[in-house]
Curated annotation (Swiss-Prot):
Keywords assigned by UniProt, alphabetized: Cytoplasm, Decarboxylase, Lyase, Porphyrin biosynthesis
Protein's UniProt name: Uroporphyrinogen decarboxylase
Domain of life, per lineage: Bacteria
Subunit structure: Homodimer.
Amino acid sequence: MAHNLLNDTFLRALLREPTDYTPIWLMRQAGRYLPEYNATRARAGSFLGLAKNPDYATEVTLQPLERFPLDAAILFSDILTIPDAMGLGLDFQVGEGPKFAHPVRTEADVAKLAVPDIEATLGYVTGAVREIRRALTDAQGRQRVPLIGFSGSPWTLACYMVEGGGSDDFRTVKSMAYSRPDLMHRILDVNAQAVAAYLNAQIEAGAQAVMIFDTWGGALADGAYQRFSLDYIRRVVSQLKREHDGERVPVITFTKGGGLWLEEIAATGVDAVGLDWTVNLGAARERVAGRVALQGNLDPTILFAPPAAVREQARAVLDSYGNHPGHVFNLGHGISQFTSPDHVAELVDEVHTHSRAIRSGAAG
């Protein structure tokens, strides 16, 4: 067991070691589906007021752990902290999502981009990591569950930086990629350096695993995905600290819509690959043949179904993977703000119960 961790099931699963049951955590597990999160956000005044205050970030990171016996905590933050630190002027408008005051569109904009000083500009994130680690640890120095740090991928960050916010079709960033690949690669190079430095700073502050969210990699065509996303994920992974404080630090990457490229993603040097719900988990396990762990991959909208259906679909995911090491249960994307916390409780219980039955051979 990782030293002083009361529950290291998540870390052992990422390293493909045997576990008594399948660990579970959920993307966006600290979020708007929880009434207590909304209460804390109201006190903070805004999303950025929440994310940039280590006390609030710690409070909301721990909220889902108070409700559910989840096997990992994930830092409460946002993937757009890096471009914000680059001076692009991040703001969240109610009902509109993130917007940048200074999108990166011209040659001059690209020339101005630089890797931010992580401690000077993103010290609130590393401060939150340290504070969360303390909050997860009891008076005897025993930590409840591991803490995950994260970043957006170079390509996904570039999507927001060039578009100036979210997009239905990403035509501005894709147009740049195809018409001025030199500018696109310059942005991606700066982003890759920044992401690696940012994740390493989180690891040094106490993150025990890190995840790269490539939310928009699946928007790219085959070939373009390799050039503009995967190549830069590989660069990031090659620069990461894989051990800290005497313990291995596993790396997860998740490309939404990336099931086509599973084998290539698995070859980037990561320890685990996250999958969305379009991928057959059992077939994916055979495709990677034990080279990496897999994370996923329940369709998050299943949580709107009645509890019996939630449990049935959770069992289907677990049965698909089978009695093999190297599976972390998660959703195929972030949990919806409209999800009932009671249904999440049903899911967590079923994952733990049924995976124990699979291990013991009692699952029918």
